[in-house]
Structure formats: structure tokens, C-alpha cells
């Protein structure tokens, strides 16, 4: 049962994180939207509170240890503890390896990989006080296949999958499960903050090239998070990665 549990969702103001925060709250959870974009965080908090859902926005930079510690402290002050953490916040860099400054590489790794490590550490301390918990890392199919000029993103997501099984083993003694989800093509246009929100601009071929027959949407990931966060339903699942990509990574590609 998820009713009354406390969840932290990083990057919960927009995109996949917003869908996860919403479904968690709709299932009776108390949700902290840990978001660096204040406009997005406030909008999402107001939108969900208008529906009677129990959510709180806390401005958070997952790449900053003090910011994370402050977010966890506020979560405990408001809701009494932490039961579930979703490490979703991430940034992207698309640039030639010959043109990308080292600082840009380091920023992506810091947010996408070090951030989840920091959040896991401080949230796990609170989970232990409550007898256990669940950490869900949002990785990517880019951990296993790539497009050109995405080295830091792919490396960070590959590292996050490895961090998942490592934490699962280390934290098992505290009854904390750790899993990861690797989304494929997820269309997030309608889940952005108002100033960026728009209708998806997708072609028929975008859907047709997926064995599932369509491009994914944030709720595809959020529904799996709801299942994985529930110890009654997913209590025997830890240390593994779920690929949610409409079958794209198992499809043979031929040029005709």
C-alpha cells in the first residue's frame, strides 16, 4: 500500500518527473517535488494542490550536497520522513566531443550521476529510521545505445544503471530496495511548465517504428514507478533495470 507514504521526486516539476509526482499523489502518497526550476515547481505544486493532492515543492539542486541536505531536512519537517526516492532530475548535452568544454561534461555527470548518489545517501538515512524504503533511478536506453554527440549523457545513464545494482546490494541490509527504469522515446511536450508546454509534433513514422506502435508518454514510466514503489506488489524486485521503450532496443534495423 502506498497510502500515506512519503515520496521525493527530483525533477518533479516537468516531464517524466511531473507524471510520477502526480500518480504518486493520486495513489495517496505525500510528495515532495524537488525541482531546480522554481517556476515549474510552483506551477506543479499549485496544479496538484488544486486537485486536493498532498504535494510540496522544495527548490533543489541535486548537484549541490547542501541543497539536497536542506531538501531532505524540509521533507522530514513537513512529512516526518522519507519512504520512496525517485532520482529523475537530469540534464543533456549534445555537442561534438571536439567542441564540448570539460566543464560541460562534468556538469552532466554531476547532475545525472553524482546527484542520484547524493540524494540516495541522505534519503536512505531517513528510510532506515522507518524500517526501509525504495529508491527508483530514472536511467535511459542511452545507457545501452547512443546517438552521436551524447557522450556525457550516455555515460551518466550507464553509470546510473551500475549505481542501481551497487546500492541495491549495499542497502539491502536496511530493507531498502533499489531499481532503475530506462525509458526510450518519451514525448514530454504536454508535461512541461506552461511557458514551454505545447502539443506533440510527431509524424506517423515516429510511432510506426516502435514495435508497440507508438511513442511513449510520461505516464508509461509513472505507472511502473507506482508498481515498483509498492512493497506488497514489488517487494521481491531489487537491483534490476526495466527498459520501457516500446520495443525499440530489441528491434533489428535494416536499410532498404
Swiss-Prot record:
Keywords: NADP, Oxidoreductase. The active site is at residue 153. The keyword NADP applies. GO terms for molecular function: oxidoreductase activity. Coiled coil: none annotated. It is an enzyme of class 1 (oxidoreductase). It comes from the Bacteria. NADP(+) binds at residues 9-33. InterPro entries: NAD(P)-bd_dom_sf, Sc_DH/Rdtase_CS, SDR_fam. Substrate binds at residue 140. Pfam families: adh_short_C2. Its EC number is 1.-.-.-. The keyword NADP applies. Belongs to the short-chain dehydrogenases/reductases (SDR) family. This is Uncharacterized oxidoreductase TM_0019. It comes from Thermotoga maritima (strain ATCC 43589 / DSM 3109 / JCM 10099 / NBRC 100826 / MSB8).
Amino acid at each position: 500500500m502506498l497510502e500515506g507514504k512519503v515520496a521525493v521526486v527530483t525533477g518533479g516539476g516537468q516531464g517524466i518527473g511531473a507524471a510520477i509526482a502526480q500518480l504518486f499523489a493520486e495513489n495517496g502518497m505525500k510528495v515532495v517535488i524537488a525541482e531546480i526550476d522554481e517556476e515549474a515547481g510552483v506551477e506543479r505544486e499549485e496544479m496538484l494542490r488544486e486537485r486536493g493532492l498532498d504535494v510540496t515543492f522544495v527548490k533543489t539542486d541535486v548537484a549541490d550536497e547542501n541543497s539536497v541536505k536542506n531538501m531532505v531536512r524540509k521533507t522530514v519537517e513537513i512529512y516526518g520522513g522519507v519512504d520512496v526516492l525517485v532520482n529523475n532530475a537530469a540534464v543533456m548535452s549534445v555537442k561534438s566531443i571536439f567542441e564540448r568544454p570539460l566543464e560541460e561534461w562534468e556538469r552532466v555527470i554531476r547532475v545525472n550521476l553524482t546527484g542520484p548518489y547524493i540524494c540516495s545517501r541522505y534519503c536512505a538515512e531517513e528510510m532506515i529510521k522507518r524500517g526501509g524504503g525504495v529508491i527508483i533511478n530514472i536511467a535511459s536506453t542511452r545507457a545501452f545505445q547512443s546517438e552521436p554527440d551524447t557522450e556525457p549523457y550516455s555515460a551518466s545513464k550507464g553509470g546510473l544503471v551500475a549505481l542501481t545494482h551497487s546500492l541495491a546490494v549495499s542497502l539491502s541490509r536496511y530493507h531498502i530496495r533499489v531499481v532503475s527504469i530506462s525509458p526510450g522515446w518519451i514525448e514530454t511536450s504536454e508535461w512541461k511548465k506552461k511557458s514551454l508546454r505545447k502539443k506533440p509534433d510527431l509524424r506517423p513514422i515516429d510511432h510506426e517504428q516502435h514495435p508497440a506502435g507508438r511513442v511513449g508518454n510520461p505516464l508509461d514510466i509513472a505507472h511502473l514507478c507506482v508498481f515498483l514503489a509498492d512493497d506488497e506488489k514489488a517487494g521481491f524486485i531489487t537491483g534490476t533495470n526495466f527498459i520501457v521503450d516500446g520495443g525499440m532496443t530489441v528491434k533489428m534495423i535494416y536499410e532498404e
